[in-house]
A protein has these predicted regions:
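Long, charged, low-complexity intrinsically disordered regions
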Residues: 1-44
Length: 44
């Protein structure tokens, strides 16, 4: 999991994260960075 900022928007890159761990990672990311909305989550 990589968190980075691009053009003023915080991104979460989930490449390489196991499917079983994604839900927990996304919830933690949103709670931690909710004041910086909009957020982008990259999966694929």
């Amino acid at each position: 999991m990589i968190v980075f900022n691009e053009n003023g928007i915080t991104h979460l890159d989930l490449h390489g994260v196991r499917h079983s761990d994604v839900s927990e990672e996304v919830i933690d990311f949103i709670f931690q960075y909710q004041k910086l909305i909009p957020l982008i989550i990259i999966c694929g």
